[in-house]
């Protein structure tokens, strides 16, 4: 067997290699490093020095013994060490020549197997993702992250180190890593959710397209402004429009409703209901402008307002005197009074109605009630009250109640009344 020699590096270099940041792994970093370590089998003695120098330049670490006994070597700046073999016989280096080739072959075969399995599973994952979702391109970056080529060198280095000592564990770890895209896909949203998510916008568009008949707030605002301008230009009042709608379409609207529509003060639902009616009225009014139509006649009737009645001071004084005598005259009294004052019966009736409303506004109700109570005699308030003993004979409340106020039922009385009612219902 060819001899293996080692060069003795300076003590400072050994300190840097062992304690100052050297590698602390007990195996080569990768399969490529394992192949480079073949320099240890020298067939010519004149290559020993160069091979030993190259050995110290490799990133691979010394043997496990060097890792465990680094602190016990006591290497310092003044120590004169000969060689590694002189200080510590390394069984790892002695047996390296015997098992190096089988280990390299196992590493190569395991690496090929792992790469084949990972590529096969990655291809299956991409096919499944492409069949499951129309947006498989969105998942490609996630799947590619677990591809063999996308892994970091450090992960590959740890995988190779594990294969040297535990090939079965390394294959299982690689298999688990290759299956990771499937778990990532399961953790994500399902294809149905993706399809529903991306089709949601289309569904909303379809729904909104089916509800095109419902106007928006902007449409209502624009129509209200246009309607008001056209109505004023045509010469119709808001009361005319409300009366015309009632005559034409059967829905009578007041002047206040039309005013609130133009001012956008109605609810959105009522605005939507009123808009088509006003639009039809506006179209008919535009088409029949200049010719006397039913709308014009209705508008003319609406514009016919009665002239405000003016009553002379003497007549008003007579009505006031009669009002103090009788605030609510009968029909015969109204007729006789109208004849005596030479007024229409309807004018007299309306005047009395307005006068009564004015009296209510001028007189607070509490004052009127207080005056009435003050005017009553003291005994009248008590004897004019409610006497329950007149109509409570035979009742559970007793027959000798002398209270002049409505009886207040206590819980005991309510319970007894309920028991009596239950007994009567049972019989």
UniProtKB/Swiss-Prot annotation:
The entry's keywords: Activator, DNA-binding, Homeobox, Nucleus, Transcription, Transcription regulation
Biased composition regions of type Gly residues, renumbered to the chain: 67-77
Protein's organism: Drosophila melanogaster
Protein family per UniProt: Belongs to the POU transcription factor family. Class-3 subfamily.
Residue ranges with Low complexity bias: 49-66
Residues annotated as transmembrane: none
Disordered: annotated segments: 39-77, 196-217, 288-309, 390-427
Task performed by this protein: Binds to a DNA sequence element required for the expression of the dopa decarboxylase gene (Ddc) in specific dopaminergic neurons. Could also play an early role in specific ectodermal cells, and a subsequent role in the embryonic nervous system.
Gene: vvl
MF (Gene Ontology): DNA-binding transcription activator activity, RNA polymerase II-specific; DNA-binding transcription factor activity, RNA polymerase II-specific; RNA polymerase II cis-regulatory region sequence-specific DNA binding; RNA polymerase II transcription regulatory region sequence-specific DNA binding
Alphabetical GO biological process terms: brain development; brain segmentation; dendrite morphogenesis; motor neuron axon guidance; peripheral nervous system development; positive regulation of antimicrobial peptide biosynthetic process; positive regulation of transcription by RNA polymerase II; regulation of dendrite morphogenesis
Keyword Nucleus: yes
Lineage, uppermost ranks: Eukaryota, Metazoa, Ecdysozoa, Arthropoda, Hexapoda
Protein name according to UniProt: POU domain protein CF1A
POU-specific domain ranges (all copies): 212-286
GO cellular component: nucleus
Pfam family, one: Homeodomain
Subcellular location field: Nucleus
Highest taxon, organism lineage: Eukaryota
DNA-binding region: 304-363
Tissues expressing the protein: Coexpressed with acj6 in overlapping subsets of neurons in the embryonic epidermis and central nervous system. First detected in the precursor of the tracheal pits and the stomodeal invagination and later in the peripheral nervous system.
